[in-house]
Amino acid sequence: MRARRFWIRTARAALLIWLAAAGVAGADPPQKEVWPEVDTWLRLSPVWRLSVFVPVSKNLETYYREGNLILQADYAWGESNRTRRLIDEDRARTMDLWLLRGGYLGGKSLDDHGAAYTEYTAFAELHLRVPLKGGVLLSHRLRSDLRWLGEGDSEFSTRLRYRLQAEKEFTAGRGSIVPYVSVEPYYDSRYETVNRVRLITGASVAWSRRAAIETNVTYQYDSRSSTKELFALNVILHLFFDASRTR
């Protein structure tokens, strides 16, 4: 019964997201993209973890493509009494309430060797996880980006992002599914305003300690971009390795 209620609430939240997206919509139809991605995770200890993300984006109408390489290090603390699998975990663990992440992102347009788009970014994130009744997890993420855009004489800017996300784990045998919904506004120093908002709904499915599949649908509105509206299908393969278990 709880699972059914959660699914109903998740569906309602997703519906509200699409209605909000439609209300923001302009005259031009939204662009459509696919975002395949491979995320590799290496756990060094119960609190330290490294990761490498390789996402690619492709516009289904113009065939424009971008690729990124993301390197990250995580430190978690504030152990709780809750055991659960998070979206980016291979299995259920005792959850830490706080997580600090630092990383680097390098990105380029793929068909012109970076002429249309080149980015180098250093970023830091602070995560706070708040368990709610019924097994629902509410998480806050605050992220700060230091960005260098363009080749050669690159333009420096900063960006602040805040993400609010709700998720809940369901289990069946050895399998685990974690549906989620999130909203994330972006503040860009180039425009001195919140110019972008992302609305996401999806799920992560794990069946072993080595792999999980995550898929989501993203709606993005950006008031300062040539592509003001965007719908994207994101499919992520998570690969997990645990060096702490060999010690």
Question: Where in this protein do the model-derived segments appear?
Answer:
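Residues that define the transmembrane beta-barrel architecture of outer-membrane proteins
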Residues: 32-34, 65-69, 118-122, 154-160, ...
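Short glycine/proline- and aromatic-enriched beta-strand/turn motifs that initiate or cap beta-hairpins
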Residues: 25-68, 238
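Detector for outer-membrane/organellar transmembrane beta-barrel domains
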Residues: 135-184
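Transmembrane beta-strands of outer-membrane beta-barrel pores
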Residues: 54-60, 104-110, 130, 144-148, ...
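Residue-level signature of outer-membrane beta-barrel architecture
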Residues: 42, 75-77, 92-93, 128-130, ...
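Transmembrane beta-strands of outer-membrane beta-barrel proteins
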Residues: 37, 49-55, 72, 86-87, ...
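Outer-membrane beta-barrel "beta-signal"
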Residues: 73-75, 126, 229-247
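Repeated loop/turn-to-beta-strand initiation elements of outer-membrane beta-barrel proteins
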Residues: 47-52, 79-84, 95-100, 133-138, ...
